[in-house]
Curated annotation (Swiss-Prot):
Signal peptide positions on this chain: none
Record keywords: Ribonucleoprotein, Ribosomal protein, RNA-binding, rRNA-binding, tRNA-binding
Taxonomic classification: Bacteria, Bacillati, Actinomycetota, Actinomycetes, Kitasatosporales
Task of the protein: One of the primary rRNA binding proteins, it binds directly to 16S rRNA where it nucleates assembly of the head domain of the 30S subunit. Is located at the subunit interface close to the decoding center, probably blocks exit of the E-site tRNA.
Organism field: Streptomyces avermitilis (strain ATCC 31267 / DSM 46492 / JCM 5070 / NBRC 14893 / NCIMB 12804 / NRRL 8165 / MA-4680)
GO biological-process terms attached to the record: translation
Transmembrane feature ranges: none
Protein name (database record): Small ribosomal subunit protein uS7
Assigned protein family: Belongs to the universal ribosomal protein uS7 family.
MF terms (GO), sorted A to Z: rRNA binding; structural constituent of ribosome; tRNA binding
GO cellular component term of the entry, any: small ribosomal subunit
PROSITE patterns reported for this sequence: RIBOSOMAL_S7
Length: 156
């Protein structure tokens, strides 16, 4: 076990175009093989598409989409005796944000549209309307936690 304690949280650099740390986090999740300019082009293209399709600030739509994706409960495996139980636990706000962004980008990549910009744009639109695979993932996670509520007393 490490003796130095937990690593300090590093501050997220604010995005120069939209002035939002959320956009920076989204760019970092889209990033592959260190190609930041490509990731920025994808995210900024999706944000401009949001502005055109919704007619309002893309940051508001992004926040609404993330609120619809963020889980409040998840399950963690806990071994008791010879059995492993799926114990429901509450998700901390930072982890909820991270999971929401991870699911959003992951399910965007799995979509069928031609470019990643289109995939991200459509997944964001679906999520902001309460639809899409990322929102379904949140519902499945909550359902799993709900069905294992009997093991909540094993929480640590």
């Amino acid at each position: 076990m490490p003796r130095k304690g937990p690593a300090p949280k590093r501050p997220v650099i604010i995005d120069p175009v939209y002035g939002s740390p959320l956009v920076t986090s989204l760019i970092n999740k889209v990033l592959l093989n260190g190609k930041r300019s490509t990731a920025e082009r994808i995210v900024y293209g999706a944000m401009e598409g949001l502005r055109e399709k919704t007619g309002n600030d893309p940051i508001i739509t992004l926040k609404r989409a993330l609120e619809n994706i963020k889980p409040t409960l998840e399950v963690k495996s806990r071994r008791v005796g010879g059995a492993t139980y799926q114990v429901p636990i509450e998700v901390k706000p930072g982890r909820a944000n991270t999971l929401a962004l991870r699911w959003l980008v992951g399910y965007s990549r799995a979509r069928r549209e031609k470019t990643m910009t289109e995939r991200l744009l459509n997944e964001l639109l679906d999520a902001s309307n309460g639809l899409g695979a990322a929102v379904k993932k949140r519902e499945d996670t909550h359902k799993m936690a709900e069905s294992n509520k009997a093991f909540a007393h094993y929480r640590w």
